[in-house]
Amino acid sequence: MNIVILAAGTGKRMRSALPKVLHPLAGRPLLSHVIDTARTLQPSRLVVVVGHGAEQVKAAVAAPDVQFAVQAEQLGTGHAVRQALPLLDPAQPTLVLYGDVPLTRASTLQRLVDAARDGRYGILTVTLDDPTGYGRIVRDASGFVTRIVEQKDASPEELKIAEINTGIIVTPTAQLSMWLGALKNENAQGEYYLTDVVELAIEAGFEVVTSQPDDEWETLGVNSKAQLAELERIHQRNVADALLVDGVTLADPARVDVRGTLRCGRDVSIDVNCVFEGNVTIADNVTIGANCVIRNASVGAGTRIDAFTHIDGAELGANTVIGPYARLRPGAQLADEAHVGNFVEVKNAVIGHGSKANHLTYIGDADIGARVNIGAGTITCNYDGANKFRTVIEDDVFVGSDTQLVAPVRVGRGVTIAAGTTIWKDVAEGVLALNEKTQTAKSGYVRPVKKKS
């Protein structure tokens, strides 16, 4: 089977410099969703017709299995499909999809393909309570499809028809070239409509069949930011429903967003306003507090992530405790039972088994062993303005509050670092490290008093 995806439109109503098919739905371009669905049908040829912003669209979705045809002028859907003909296998049927219709299920498309076997012409239709704006399916007294009429060209009687054309079709490819060549642009838009091919197929004696999706929203397209927002919410609700079916507890299914792939184990609980981006894996018995953002991360079993935590590109072991208000940046690796508390940032660092950094700390480019305590206000000074350096803290080290570790530096096993110490040299195992200071008390000191006006 050939699949052609039309993605050449300008999208004027989006009021954006970004090509319409590249606007994100759940964090990925609309067109990417359509291509992914198309791939599940295992086409022999997959062709995307580009036009407006062609190079930008190509760059966004380029892949070995995707070919591109260019529609230099936007002269209608029939003209767009014509540009793809040289890339198609004429011996295989062609399924036509749209780059701005991202939610159609693969099963819906497969039913249409099955209905159109043996050289039939298939149309995906929907019956709507309000069909305003859509092309109508015109049938004869026996119920056979005779033509499709666009809203702007429909008569008053035809406007009463509730069954509409979604634009998604399956057609014999060998005849499609001839039919497209016979199209005329004698309509209100002055365009070559793909919908007019159905009349030519009927005239040629081809049987026209129809199929409908399980849900109306499967064929909704995007022509404005309002419609994009509507589809986003539909998609997110579908994702939430799937999570609930899998046993995930969602405090409010309407207030969780998944912008990528989220895989959850058993007994996972997610509070409100959480966002998951990229590829996220969550093991069993994980609790996630409100307003967390988790991106491209893996979370070990039994972990608790408290509210307002941001995790990006991190790996969390089992039974870790994170947050609230913690930030784990790319390269953060936490071993089992590690704790990272409020206003702690970890970047490109390993924190060992049972180690804790509970308050107001920056750990960057560091290797921290097991059972290490990092006091509040500790900073690994990893950057000299040009280069990054690593800090190594071995097992069982106690780091007092307000400590600065100036990398590159190594702190040996079992060291105790006194509060307020700056470490700029390696520290041997088992010692107390401190910067000796003198505390002075001056008698007779008078605190300044603010003058009253």
From Swiss-Prot:
Signal peptide location: none
Active site: 359
Reactions catalysed: alpha-D-glucosamine 1-phosphate + acetyl-CoA = N-acetyl-alpha-D-glucosamine 1-phosphate + CoA + H(+); N-acetyl-alpha-D-glucosamine 1-phosphate + UTP + H(+) = UDP-N-acetyl-alpha-D-glucosamine + diphosphate
GO biological process, one term: cell morphogenesis
Region (Pyrophosphorylase): 1-225
The keyword Transcription regulation is annotated on this UniProt entry: no
Positions annotated to bind acetyl-CoA: 376, 382-383, 401, 419
Keywords: Acyltransferase, Cell shape, Cell wall biogenesis/degradation, Cytoplasm, Magnesium, Metal-binding, Multifunctional enzyme, Nucleotidyltransferase, Peptidoglycan synthesis, Repeat, Transferase
Residue span of region N-acetyltransferase: 247-453
Protein name in the entry: Bifunctional protein GlmU
Taxon lineage: Bacteria, Pseudomonadati, Pseudomonadota, Betaproteobacteria, Burkholderiales
